[in-house]
């Protein structure tokens, strides 16, 4: 019997099954069964329910071992978010705690379970609360693309799952002969997808460890990093430099943190400076090119974000994709594709 219920009714959306994981032939894992108005975790006896797998494929792309399983208020459990990370589970909480029943049920899966409190210092790493002690660093698949994941890292474990569909589109929009710039690149996931599409990439981040991690992700996917560009420093200063040099790109990705301070102490706030960032990037865009503009700033509404971006690129076409289907809760991610008409 499941221990997590909504309004007293058990739900069969989830079951513990086998999933994609590099270096482990058949790890047990939590997979989506089907989207429903109520939420629960099912017992392991459903592991051989093949119908569950077929319905799961309609939501999660093939060869994907990382996705959101329970999405807070969207699944009737405000403040609790459960992510599958290959054969590990990450439970994030905001303004609440994991109940004893849920923790017990997570322990019963036999998988390593990690807990991260989102209201605490975002640089703190998750804490393992259950399951066997497996390596904290491992490789996981997303849409057939390999990424290094690190459960001991603070801020994030190496990839933002809510950008999965955007990464796929970046790959589709990239082609041999194209140049793609990924600013605020973190571990270079967008860059890897663009390179797999055939583009030459420039990966830009303020932190050298992130650029080193990005190089590892290229290698994991059979891409020689020496054929790509990596730039350390402030994105705004690099964009100004590219514009002065006349260096342009067919695609540019802008996904800055909500707040940051560069190595000179200059502050960047999305709600105040995003439009200026887009205007800088426009000067580096090839005619007919595209930009992906995103932000998870909760202080900024979708319409305000759209107006801010539109003012920076008058006459350009702006479109917005839906959130991935496993993110059914708060529509927090501001996102716009910009196409040079």
Regions found by a protein language model. Name each.
Residues 212-247:
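S-adenosyl-L-methionine
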Residues 75-76, 83, 99-161, 168:
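Non-catalytic substrate-recognition/targeting regions of SAM-dependent transferases
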Residues 200-205:
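Conserved SAM-binding motif I beta-strand of class I
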Residues 187-199:
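Conserved SAM-binding loop of SAM-dependent methyltransferases across substrates and taxa
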Residues 177-183:
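Conserved class I S-adenosyl-L-methionine
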Residues 235-238, 242-311:
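S-adenosylmethionine
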Residues 1-86:
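Non-catalytic accessory regions of SAM-dependent methyltransferases
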């Amino acid at each position: 019997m499941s221990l997590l219920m909504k309004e007293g009714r058990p739900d069969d959306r989830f079951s513990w099954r086998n999933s994609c994981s590099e270096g482990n032939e058949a790890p047990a894992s939590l997979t989506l069964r089907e989207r429903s108005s109520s939420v629960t975790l099912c017992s392991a006896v459903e592991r051989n329910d093949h119908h569950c797998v077929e319905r799961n494929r309609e939501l999660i792309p093939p060869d994907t071992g990382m996705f959101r399983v329970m999405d807070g208020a969207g699944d009737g459990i405000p403040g609790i978010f459960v992510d599958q990370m290959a054969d590990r589970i990450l439970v994030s909480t905001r303004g609440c705690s994991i109940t004893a029943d849920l923790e017990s049920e997570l322990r019963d899966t036999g998988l390593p379970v990690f807990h991260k409190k989102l209201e605490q210092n975002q640089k703190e790493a998750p804490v393992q609360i259950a399951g066997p002690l497996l390596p904290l660093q491992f490789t996981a698949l997303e849409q057939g693309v390999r990424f290094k994941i690190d459960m001991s890292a603070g801020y994030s474990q190496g990839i933002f799952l809510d950008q999965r569909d955007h990464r796929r589109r970046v790959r589709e929009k990239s082609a041999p002969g194209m140049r793609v710039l990924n600013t605020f690149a973190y571990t270079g996931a967008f860059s890897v997808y663009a390179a797999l599409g055939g583009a030459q990439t420039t990966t830009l981040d303020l932190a050298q460890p992130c650029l080193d991690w990005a190089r590892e992700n290229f290698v994991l996917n059979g891409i020689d990093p020496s054929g790509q560009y990596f730039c350390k420093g402030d994105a705004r200063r690099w964009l100004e430099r590219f514009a002065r040099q006349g260096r342009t790109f067919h695609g540019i990705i802008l996904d800055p943190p909500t707040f940051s301070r560069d190595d000179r102490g200059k502050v960047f706030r999305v709600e105040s400076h995003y439009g200026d960032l887009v205007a800088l990037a426009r000067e580096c865009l090839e005619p007919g090119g595209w930009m992906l503009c995103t932000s998870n700033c909760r202080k900024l509404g979708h319409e305000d974000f759209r107006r801010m971006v539109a003012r920076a690129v008058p006459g350009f076409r702006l479109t917005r994709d839906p959130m991935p289907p496993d993110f059914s809760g708060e529509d927090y991610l501001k996102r716009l594709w910009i196409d040079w008409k």
